[in-house]
């Protein structure tokens, strides 16, 4: 077969070729119009970093090192004091330095307790019997108040009056003790009802300590049986006791009600002075 020879096509083959060409033309013509728009791309989601450490790290940049920290010298840490060996030395070091728990007073010797109470009584007695008029806050002088001192002075005054009496010694002691104890309670309630800023037992302690000058006067009058001497001694000790109670009671109440608080105190001390003079 030469190149000039051609293969004749049948009618069915020619129609198939024409049909394929028509379909291809139709597909090219209708293609651009029926293509759906492309789906917009989804936004990029931020990724969450996963850390294996239990603490969340901050995104803030680290602070730059200061120049002073590089030049600053590291101070050496002082070594702790050596522990006491054992026994009484350890207790003395803790109690003397003031560190640790306070000493247990339940296990201390009786003599140490008595010395501590006596020193407290002497300190409070100095504050009351010798008041300082220039003290900034005289009303708070008895912060460490106690009732042993006032109880002792009340009992001592009752015993002194009973020893001075020639008859009915027990009745004299009962009257003196009841007068002083009930009078101190009534005077304290009077100050509180007047709006005074004072503790109940602190006021009882104060009024009991102020009886010390009258105790001294009762002892002098018991030793010297002279009416004129008794009157002079009682007048001096009465003024002393009133002067000792004045700064504390006046500071506890309103200045407008000062007389209402001081007059009953003076009246009770006058009654005690009358008992000292009258008992023979």
From Swiss-Prot:
InterPro entries attached here? Yip1/4-like, Yip1_dom
Describe the inactivation phenotype.
No visible phenotype. The double mutant yip4a yip4b exhibits disturbed trans-Golgi network (TGN)-Golgi association and cell elongation defects leading to reduced roots and hypocotyls growth associated with an abnormal cell wall composition and a mislocalization of trans-Golgi network (TGN)-localized proteins SYP61 and VHA-a1. The double mutant yip4a yip4b also has a reduced number of root trichoblasts displaying Rho-of-plant (ROPs e.g. ARAC4/ROP2, ARAC5/ROP4 and ARAC3/ROP6) patches and leading to an almost complete absence of root hairs.
Show the stretches that span the lipid bilayer: 147-167, 172-192, 193-213, 231-251, 259-279
The segments annotated as topological domain Lumenal are 168-171, 214-230, 280
- One protein family per Pfam: Yip1
| GO BP annotations, alphabetical order | endoplasmic reticulum to Golgi vesicle-mediated transport; pectin biosynthetic process; plant organ development; plant-type cell wall cellulose biosynthetic process; polysaccharide transport; protein transport; regulation of protein transport; root development
Classify the protein's membrane topology as the record does. Answer: Multi-pass membrane protein
The reply on keyword Transport is yes
What family is this protein classified in? Belongs to the YIP1 family.
Subunit structure and binding partners: Homodimer and heterodimer with YIP4A. Component of a trans-Golgi network (TGN)-localized ECH/YIP4 complex made of ECH, YIP4A and YIP4B. Interacts directly with ECH.
Q: What is this protein called?
A: Protein YIP4b
Q: Which organism is it from?
A: Arabidopsis thaliana (Mouse-ear cress)
Lineage at the top is: Eukaryota, Viridiplantae, Streptophyta, Embryophyta, Tracheophyta
Gene name of this polypeptide: YIP4B
């Amino acid at each position: 077969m030469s190149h000039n020879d051609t293969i004749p096509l049948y009618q069915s083959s020619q129609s198939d070729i024409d049909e394929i060409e028509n379909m291809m033309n139709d597909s090219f013509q209708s293609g651009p119009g029926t293509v759906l728009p492309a789906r917009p791309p989804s936004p990029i989601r931020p990724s969450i970093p996963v850390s294996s450490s239990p603490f969340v790290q901050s995104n803030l940049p680290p602070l730059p090192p200061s120049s002073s920290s590089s030049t600053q010298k590291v101070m050496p840490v002082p070594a702790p004091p050596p522990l006491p060996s054992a026994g009484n030395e350890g207790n003395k070091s803790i109690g003397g330095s003031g560190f640790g728990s306070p000493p247990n007073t339940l296990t201390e010797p009786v003599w140490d307790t008595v010395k501590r109470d006596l020193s407290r009584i002497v300190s409070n007695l100095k504050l009351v019997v010798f008041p300082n008029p220039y003290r900034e806050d005289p009303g708070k002088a008895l912060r460490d108040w106690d009732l042993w001192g006032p109880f002792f002075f009340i009992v001592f005054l009752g015993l002194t009056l009973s020893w001075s009496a020639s008859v009915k010694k027990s009745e004299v002691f009962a009257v003196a003790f009841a007068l002083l104890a009930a009078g101190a309670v009534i005077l304290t309630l009077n100050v509180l009802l007047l709006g005074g800023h004072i503790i109940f037992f602190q006021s009882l302690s104060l009024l009991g300590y102020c009886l010390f000058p009258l105790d001294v006067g009762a002892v002098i009058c018991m030793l010297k049986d002279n009416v004129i001497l008794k009157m002079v001694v009682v007048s001096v000790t009465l003024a002393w006791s009133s002067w000792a109670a004045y700064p504390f009671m006046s500071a506890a109440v309103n200045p407008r009600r000062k007389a209402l608080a001081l007059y009953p105190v003076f009246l009770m001390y006058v009654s005690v002075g009358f008992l000292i003079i009258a008992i023979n």
